[in-house]
């Protein structure tokens, strides 16, 4: 008798995705982040669902409802902080996942890569609207500042901003619609993630060498289910450690002050995972220019497959490209640090230089290094 997992219509899909999937035998732990992102998404949807049961999307009660969750709901504090820190874990895994794709040339899977960029944008939108929900000072002012950026769009800017706000300022209508967006977007992310996986399984996974591995494949289960389980345990342990010992480490103290439209915080900044893009936005003195640079800081990923000039797929055997890649990582961290600092003397110039370097590395230096490496192959 044939095994039911290979014949049953539903079980067959699961089997071909997670059990009998032919996988390269040499993929490293950098390939764990895809499954970890799936785990993060499931954790966020579950904790978010329980939070939504007690949260009220109203300007007068939103802040108190979050306090009520933390004080009066059974393990509400745990659910709330798991959700808040889960977002940080999500972005750590995401940046590692994108970094790995850049390093090993996985972006040559064009469809998978493009869906990935779409996923990144959707995730950033979800995190942004979610940060507004507790209705603290940073929630309110973050929403005001970031939505206001749309007013830089010629002709329709101001109308667009008021349309998003649902009035003439960030108010009850804004909070209600942001809650609606924050509830629906994770399910859109889930759908996109399935499509992402679907496209990936059309081609099969890449591997550290970047060389086709069709002659050397092993079943996903038990080899990579074990490997992914270890990654999952490390993720859960890190998440719990962060949540139980330093729940507010990555948050902003200003968000413990209820939103007050009459009092602007000294330094408005988003959550840490947006700081690199925020630093790029602030490094340009012109409003429209800043908004375009902010958009391009993520959209630039879409140009990477077109800028792949190397004869090799992976950076494993390309020392110049490796050096530039790690420069890009250092630049990303520098931008993240500068985005969290006030716009004043020592930070402005390094921020502008780091922003220029960010685009220069991706658009000019890395493709040029690849061409030089191609020449060196002939030596």
Swiss-Prot record:
Residues the entry annotates as binding heme b b566: 97, 196
Q: Where does heme b b562 bind?
A: 83, 182
Name of the protein = Cytochrome b
List the molecular function annotations (GO) for this entry: metal ion binding; ubiquinol-cytochrome-c reductase activity
Q: How does it sit in the membrane?
A: Multi-pass membrane protein
Q: What does this protein do?
A: Component of the ubiquinol-cytochrome c reductase complex (complex III or cytochrome b-c1 complex) that is part of the mitochondrial respiratory chain. The b-c1 complex mediates electron transfer from ubiquinol to cytochrome c. Contributes to the generation of a proton gradient across the mitochondrial membrane that is then used for ATP synthesis.
Q: Which family does it belong to?
A: Belongs to the cytochrome b family.
Q: Which Pfam families is this protein grouped with?
A: Cytochrom_B_C, Cytochrome_B
Residues annotated for a ubiquinone binding in this entry: 201
Q: Which residues cross the membrane?
A: 33-53, 77-98, 113-133, 178-198, 226-246, 288-308, 320-340, 347-367
Misc. remarks from the entry:
Heme 1 (or BL or b562) is low-potential and absorbs at about 562 nm, and heme 2 (or BH or b566) is high-potential and absorbs at about 566 nm.
Query: This protein's superkingdom?
Result: Eukaryota
Q: Which GO terms describe its cellular component?
A: mitochondrial inner membrane; respiratory chain complex III
| Record GO biological process | mitochondrial electron transport, ubiquinol to cytochrome c
Task: Write out the annotated subcellular location.
Answer: Mitochondrion inner membrane
The alphabetical list of record keywords is:
Electron transport, Heme, Iron, Membrane, Metal-binding, Mitochondrion, Mitochondrion inner membrane, Respiratory chain, Transmembrane, Transmembrane helix, Transport, Ubiquinone
Covalent S-S links between cysteines: none
């Amino acid at each position: 008798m044939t095994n039911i997992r290979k014949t049953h219509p539903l079980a067959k899909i699961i089997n071909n995705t997670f059990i009998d999937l032919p996988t390269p035998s040499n993929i490293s732990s950098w390939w764990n982040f895809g499954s970890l992102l799936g785990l993060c998404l499931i954790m966020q949807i579950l904790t978010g669902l329980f939070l939504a049961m007690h949260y009220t999307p109203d300007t007068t009660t939103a802040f108190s409802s979050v306090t009520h969750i933390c004080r009066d709901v059974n393990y509400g504090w745990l659910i709330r902080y798991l959700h808040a820190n889960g977002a940080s874990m999500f972005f750590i895994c995401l940046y590692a996942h994108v970094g790995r794709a850049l390093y090993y040339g996985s972006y040559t899977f064009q469809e998978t890569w493009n869906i990935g960029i779409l996923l990144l944008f959707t995730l950033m939108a979800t995190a942004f609207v979610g940060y507004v929900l507790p209705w603290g000072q940073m929630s309110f002012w973050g929403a005001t500042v970031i939505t206001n950026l749309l007013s830089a769009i010629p002709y329709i800017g101001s109308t667009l901003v008021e349309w998003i706000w649902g009035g003439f300022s960030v108010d009850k209508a804004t909070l209600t619609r942001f809650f609606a967006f924050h509830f629906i977007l994770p399910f859109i992310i889930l759908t996109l993630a399935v499509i992402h996986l679907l496209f990936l399984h059309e081609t099969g996974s890449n591997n550290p060498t970047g060389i086709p591995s069709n002659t050397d494949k092993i079943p996903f289960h038990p080899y990579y289910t074990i490997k992914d389980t270890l990654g999952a345990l490390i993720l859960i342990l890190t998440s719990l450690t962060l949540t139980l010992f330093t729940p507010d480490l990555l948050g902003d103290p200003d968000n413990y002050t209820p939103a007050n439209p009459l009092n602007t915080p000294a330094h408005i900044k988003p959550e840490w995972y947006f700081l690199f893009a925020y630093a790029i936005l602030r490094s340009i003195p012109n409003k429209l220019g800043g908004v375009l640079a902010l958009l391009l800081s993520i959209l630039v990923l879409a140009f990477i497959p077109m800028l792949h000039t190397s004869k090799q797929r992976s950076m494993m055997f390309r020392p110049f490209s490796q050096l530039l890649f790690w420069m890009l990582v250092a630049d990303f961290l520098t931008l993240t640090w500068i985005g969290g600092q006030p716009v004043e003397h020592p930070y402005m110039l390094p921020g502008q230089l780091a922003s220029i370097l960010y685009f220069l590395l991706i658009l000019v230096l890395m493709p040029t290094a690849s061409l030089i490496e191609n020449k060196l192959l002939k030596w």
